[in-house]
């Protein structure tokens, strides 16, 4: 070994703890990167701690010398076959579990939809008849058909036919003079066109659609019993109740929105009170 | 009206469209705030549009004069009783729906937990016996008892007894020389204490707990059938299978974590290859 390299070896010092050979003869040294001079040598133990800090618990993270940017060559003892298999299984489970958990959530919502569908069938057609229908039906048809009930209700609820009726109403309102007698002020022109009202915050309108759709069969059954008690068939009575409810609610909604529209249109901004000026 | 005020009225101009009285004799004027001079007067119609813009669809938002900061006095036609009731109902529904939707979600998870509990009872105790037990049980007890099954499984899964065993192992490993023969290298001291490994990302560990807990009864049943087929009682067989599975899995896990620990402890950082230096 040339004298110069030997000399360098003898007066090396660790760039982590600054100790030299005299301070600790037994310590193991390593030159992990391309650096020369005072940052060439470092204790193996000191460097390990330094790398631990840099990795912050992620033992597979790569670490490089902050000065010459050379990546440290970190090697581990070979994995035994058992540990290799366990490691593989561990990583597979970690990868699969988020998807399995998502599957559980979807399964939970699906199962609730099936149950809701079954309850709705019994509610609309009648308890006993509903059970008979479902017992006779093909299980596969049930597992697909029942959850479509809430889906259909939600999609149906998303159809905003009232807004369509409102647009027609405003478009042809001046031709609707005859309606003026029933709904006063229905046909007269508005002094100004108010700004389009903000639609409800997304989450509120989404929850309104969900709740409105899921409670609809119950309301249809109640309205059916109240208004069409003379109709014997549960199904027909509930369907009539549903149609009546949609129509009545729609009429109220159209009227309400039109009144809000008119209210906005007839909004007034007053003069600032005189006396406050003096 | 004093001459000066009259004169001001005559040469007023709208600070939105800059039109004066001559440009539009019929336009309605308003002085909505404390401003004087050229920004005192404005057309009612122009100010309405300006306010619409400021409100961006939120018709109840308050608007103030950008200069004197006086709030505009915006008044609406009085609400009719029907519209008042409809408005009230509309706002109530908007407030209640988010909570109702949250209730539906919780109900969905609860209902899935009840179903999972029932399926697990039938799986562990046996299909027919499970049904008998549940038919004889008090419905209220079922509606509370069944969902606690998945809850108990999840809580049980969160007990990390393997880590406790590991800590004991590392604490008294040097006294465990006798184990050295079974698990080579189990007792010998480690060259360094590796950094604590990062726990799994929260969502991964949460999903692992959820999936591990919910799949446990199925695994316990299978292990029970494989290892304790001589045991007649379904329940006992499944319990034995569960205990065996937990013990075996725990042993593997402790061994695996200890091997990872040792692997980290015997990690080495090599010298940077010489030839690359020249």
UniProtKB/Swiss-Prot annotation, chains A, B:
GO biological process per UniProt: negative regulation of cytoplasmic pattern recognition receptor signaling pathway; positive regulation of cGAS/STING signaling pathway; positive regulation of mitochondrial fission; positive regulation of NLRP3 inflammasome complex assembly; protein autoubiquitination; protein K27-linked ubiquitination; protein K48-linked ubiquitination; protein K63-linked ubiquitination
UniProt binding sites for Zn(2+) 1: 14, 17, 43, 46
EC number(s) reported in the record: 2.3.2.27
Listed GO MF terms: GTPase binding; ubiquitin protein ligase activity; zinc ion binding
Tissue: Expressed in brain, heart, liver, lung, spleen, stomach, testis, skeletal and muscle.
Membrane-topology descriptor: Multi-pass membrane protein
Zinc finger (RING-CH-type) stretch: 6-75
Pathway the protein contributes to: Protein modification; protein ubiquitination
Subcellular location: Mitochondrion outer membrane; Endoplasmic reticulum membrane; Peroxisome membrane
SMART domains in UniProt: RINGv (SM00744)
InterPro entries: Znf_RING-CH (IPR011016), Znf_RING/FYVE/PHD (IPR013083)
Catalytic activity: S-ubiquitinyl-[E2 ubiquitin-conjugating enzyme]-L-cysteine + [acceptor protein]-L-lysine = [E2 ubiquitin-conjugating enzyme]-L-cysteine + N(6)-ubiquitinyl-[acceptor protein]-L-lysine
Gene3D superfamilies given in the database record: Zinc/RING finger domain, C3HC4 (zinc finger)
Signal peptide: none
Major localisation: mitochondrion
Domain notes from UniProt: The RING-CH-type zinc finger domain is required for E3 ligase activity.
Identification of the protein by name: E3 ubiquitin-protein ligase MARCHF5
Source species taxonomy: Eukaryota, Metazoa, Chordata, Craniata, Vertebrata
